[in-house]
């Protein structure tokens, strides 16, 4: 299953990793390949590009956002449509020190994050991404986060 195409993806992921800030680079080429769709999601969010976000999502994927101790559930497609609406507020999500684990065609990314609006931290917490290897690429199957307002000042 992880033949020539997988090796190409790993090399491509490694090559793309040189464009990533050091704080979100993973240790191995395989881990870097897992982070490619995560970073593409963040890029699509910043550009408010719902189609770019959907390209790295498994159809039917889900999201759970913990807000004020309560889970808010939505589909990944619904999230992309919501974030992809035009707006004047700039948004950016940053992760750091990602913990990446891979078992064959499943992967998980656990990382602290900050979400910025107009360059200021709006909320922070931990992101959890579940990814699947399908059709020769990693896709985000689900996302959960612990968004909270009590973020450390940086």
Question: Which residue ranges define each predicted feature?
Answer:
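Surface-exposed, charged secondary-structure patches
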Residues: 62, 76-121
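Short, low-complexity N-terminal intrinsically disordered segments enriched in polar/charged residues
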Residues: 2, 20-55, 59, 154
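Sec-dependent signal peptide recognition
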Residues: 4-11, 131
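Extracytoplasmic
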Residues: 48, 58, 95, 104-106, ...
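N-terminal, post-signal-peptide region of Sec/Tat-exported proteins
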Residues: 46-86
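A mature extracytoplasmic/lumenal domain signature
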Residues: 57, 67, 111-115, 127, ...
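Short beta-strand edge/turn micro-motifs at domain boundaries
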Residues: 124-150
């Amino acid at each position: 299953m992880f033949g020539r195409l997988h090796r190409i993806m790993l090399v491509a992921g490694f090559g793309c990793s040189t464009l990533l800030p050091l704080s979100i680079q993973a240790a191995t080429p395989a881990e870097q390949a897992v982070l490619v769709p995560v970073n593409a999601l963040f890029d699509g969010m910043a550009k408010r590009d719902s189609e770019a976000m959907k390209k790295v999502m498994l159809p039917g994927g889900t999201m759970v956002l913990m807000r004020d101790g309560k889970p808010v559930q939505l589909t990944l497609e619904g999230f992309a449509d919501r974030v992809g609406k035009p707006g004047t507020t700039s948004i950016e999500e940053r992760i750091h020190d990602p913990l990446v684990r891979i078992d064959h065609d499943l992967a998980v990314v656990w990382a602290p994050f900050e979400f910025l609006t107009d360059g200021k931290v709006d909320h922070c917490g931990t992101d959890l991404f579940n990814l699947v290897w399908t059709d020769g690429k990693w896709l985000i199957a689900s996302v959960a986060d612990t968004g909270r307002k009590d973020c450390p000042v940086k």
